[in-house]
From Swiss-Prot:
The gene is PAE8. It is found in: Secreted, Cell wall. It is an enzyme of class 3 (hydrolase). InterPro entries: AB_hydrolase_fold, PAE/NOTUM. SUPFAM superfamilies: alpha/beta-Hydrolases. The keyword Calcium does not apply. Disruption phenotype: Reduced inflorescence stem growth and increased levels of acetate in rosette leaves. Hydrolyzes acetyl esters in homogalacturonan regions of pectin. In type I primary cell wall, galacturonic acid residues of pectin can be acetylated at the O-2 and O-3 positions. Decreasing the degree of acetylation of pectin gels in vitro alters their physical properties. GO terms for cellular component: extracellular region. The active site is at residues 172, 268, 335. One of its GO terms (biological process) is cell wall organization. Belongs to the pectinacetylesterase family. This is Pectin acetylesterase 8. PANTHER family: NOTUM-RELATED (PTHR21562), PECTIN ACETYLESTERASE 8 (PTHR21562:SF93).
Length: 397
């Protein structure tokens, strides 16, 4: 009976995936990018996937920046350059578009007929790096900022220059990039274009880990230094703080002039695994079972995570009140909710104030309603889709 139930669950999930990911979009390599030095870690050209809009959405654009962490030293950047996160040679030719990228109204009611773009991530520093020199021993190229500009210029030439609406979105490292590039994206478009930015799971918190060490601060310092990112971070932040601090949204977002929507889990699974309890702070693996499934967490670990949530909320609320900043902070153990159909818009999607993520974002983009809600603490929200991992899923940084 148990095996039959498991098989039925697998079948239903498979049908959901088949139905919602029916659209596969071809890859496009950026023309003349290599000549401009706008390249992935391995020197290959950057890439994106574009599905053209139609009808009422023909002059509206949604740009989704791919996530995938960062590389903070030569060794892990060399490893990365042999994967899709460092080389367009390793990227799939056809990419499934679902959730916020879906072309079906029933799965993506507000953006289904927009021009929808997935910008591939292959620079390892959230599209911020720019180092001219290339070490011949490694052939590593740190050119994320050039990649960003080259892709945007090509999209402008393909019609984005005529956009009536434009949303810059992204997940994880892409969510951080959508936040940091928000105002520069606005500057690329005509004054008459309505421009907004959405950061999904990109609000990485500057905090100490369970051993009391500022692990993520040191990690970001290494990323910014290696990639030469300082000159490409928002000047409104770098004029006040060290460049590495400007990799943290809590020090950047207040100065962003373009309307911004922050979508994040207060118990973000990536942050729990890599900021709160990274491997270096947990040498005996006491947090491993908890990180794989929040239901396995000991009460003392839940207490630490509740404190993390309060610190996260303090950073978000500390941005100050804004009549243009949207917010959907749920209490789910998850990461990236715009790219998964069941989180974005489904019969049992996570809700706050009886509102799905897709509706909250859509209402904000179209100025129907300003959504600014923070969930009650775990485990109060029964609509959450808590992620369950295996030890092989995305090993910690």
């Amino acid at each position: 009976m148990f095996k039959l139930k498991q098989w039925l669950i697998y079948l239903v999930c498979s049908l959901v995936i088949m139905n919602t990911e029916g659209l596969f979009v071809n890859i496009t390599f950026v023309r003349n990018a290599v000549a401009k030095g706008a390249v992935c870690l391995d020197g290959s050209p950057p890439a994106y996937h574009l599905d053209r809009g139609s009808g009422t959405g023909i002059n509206s654009w949604l740009i989704q920046l791919e996530g995938g962490g960062w590389c903070n030293n030569v060794t892990n950047c060399v490893s990365r350059m042999h994967t899709r996160l460092g080389s367009s040679k390793k990227m799939v030719e056809n990419l499934a578009f679902s959730a916020i990228l879906s072309n079906k109204k029933q799965y993506n009611p507000d953006f289904y007929n927009w021009n929808r773009v997935k910008v591939r991530y292959c620079d390892g520093a959230s599209f911020t790096g720019d180092v001219e020199a290339v070490n011949p021993a490694t052939n590593l190229h740190f050119r994320g900022a050039r990649v960003w500009l080259a892709v945007m210029q090509e999209l402008l030439a393909k019609g984005m220059i005529n956009a009536e609406n434009a949303v810059l979105s992204g997940c994880s490292a892409g969510g951080l990039a959508s936040l940091m590039h928000c105002d520069s994206f606005r500057a690329l478009l005509p004054m008459g274009t309505k421009v907004k930015c959405l950061s999904d799971a990109g609000f990485f918190l500057n905090t100490r880990d369970v051993s009391g060490v500022q692990y993520i601060k040191t990690y970001f310092e290494d990323v910014v230094t290696l990639h030469g990112s300082a000159k490409n971070l928002p000047r409104s932040c770098t004029s006040r703080l060290t460049p590495a601090m400007c990799f943290f949204p809590q020090y950047v977002a207040r100065q962003i002039r373009t309307p911004l929507f922050i979508l994040n889990a207060a118990y973000d699974s990536w942050q729990i695994k890599n900021i709160l309890a990274p491997r270096a702070a947990d040498p005996y693996g006491k947090w491993q079972s908890c990180q794989l499934d929040i239901k396995n967490c000991h009460p003392s670990q839940i207490k630490v995570m509740q404190d993390f949530r309060l610190e996260f909320l303090s950073a978000v609320i500390g941005l100050g009140r804004s009549s243009s900043r949207g917010m959907f902070i749920d209490s789910c153990y998850t990461h990236c909710q715009t790219e998964t159909q069941t989180s974005w818009f489904w019969q049992d999607s996570p809700i706050l104030n009886r509102t799905t993520i897709a509706k909250a974002v859509g209402d904000w983009v179209y100025d129907r309603t300003l959504f600014q809600k923070i969930d009650c603490p775990y485990p109060c929200n029964p609509t959450c889709h808590h992620r369950v991992f295996t030890p092989l899923d995305a090993p910690p940084i």
